[in-house]
Amino acid sequence: EEFIRDNDAEPGFLGMYDFPNTLCVSPNYEVVHGIPNKKPLQDGDIISIDCGVLKNGFYGDHAYTFKIGEITTEIQKLLDTALESLYLGIREFKEGNRVGDISSAIQNHNESNGYGVVRELVGHGLGKDLHESPEIPNFGKKGNGKKFVNGMVIAIEPMINMGTEKVNFLSDGWTVETADKLPSVHFEHDVAMIDGKPLLLSTFDFIYDALGIKSNEENEFKWNEISN
């Protein structure tokens, strides 16, 4: 919160629908909307951080799932597959395509790898409001839904479970968990359509710099797919 305010912006989540915090912090089998607490993280955990910001009258919304120490190869594959599906979805955000083109690209990539695609939670348009039309589900049929036009801005955010797609909503009114208590991951980018093609408004580069990851190498194939 201090960093956001120091950069002349306001927390986008704090107080939104009465949410009590600046960040959504969701470890392991929490899918989204986790409320920060003081429980220590352990080697092998994963944790998704979702952050919203309001600056100059417009919202940004962004999420990344971090790994803590050494994780299993099974969890690494889940992370890789979900992140790949984010970029495959972004590739479909072009003039003349429809919401279902993004949805089916994300769904097919994850389900073909054996993962559950959450149904109850979706991506969305954004701008002067945090959640605007259209909804961007991570499941659907190619060619269905609202047609994309230049100038649209959307948040694409795969929420992918290692096991079942089913989730439970906890009594705190916010936290969503996988029904089978297997891990879940969440990645999110904001994308504008300019000249009929996707333009990223968010970046993971600051995260990659902090973690010592060479982001260009990691994402090269994904951006090649988008540009082609």
Give short role names for the model-derived ranges.
Residues 1-228:
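Active-site neighborhoods and metal-handling regions in enzymes and metal-associated proteins
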